[in-house]
């Protein structure tokens, strides 16, 4: 699945299954930035999001809803049904990762920056 490859390509991304075989949990420095799971017959991903952007994305895409089993202000669930363009989905993945990295303790964040560079961690949000 392409989304799993995108998620694992993020610097120091780790895949974990703390809740059993579903969901697949993606972390950086022990902090979750994405959860990949099935809801019925559809693959979905939970992604962290700036609250204002979260609302805008929900208005723009029917496949984007408040985060399933998450803080609905800060997380969106995206149904991977093909209705969200790949470029937009990748931007959402990058944004989620960036928000989590920015929320890390200073020493953890600086360590990541030293090992990978700011552009690898923050992309266009650097």
Listing of model-derived features with the role each one plays in the protein:
Residues 1-126:
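Charge-dense, helix-prone N-terminal extensions
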């Amino acid at each position: 699945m392409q989304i799993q490859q995108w998620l694992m390509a993020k610097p120091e991304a780790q895949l974990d299954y703390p809740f059993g075989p579903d969901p697949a949990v993606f972390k950086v420095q022990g902090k979750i930035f994405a959860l990949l799971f099935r809801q019925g017959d559809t693959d979905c991903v939970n992604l962290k999001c700036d609250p204002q952007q979260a609302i805008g994305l929900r208005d723009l895409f029917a496949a984007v809803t408040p985060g399933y089993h998450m803080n609905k202000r800060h997380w969106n669930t995206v149904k991977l049904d093909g209705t969200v363009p790949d470029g937009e989905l990748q931007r959402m993945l990058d944004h989620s990762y960036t928000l989590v990295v920015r929320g890390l303790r200073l020493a953890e964040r600086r360590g990541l920056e030293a090992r990978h560079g700011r552009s690898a961690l923050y992309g266009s949000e650097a």
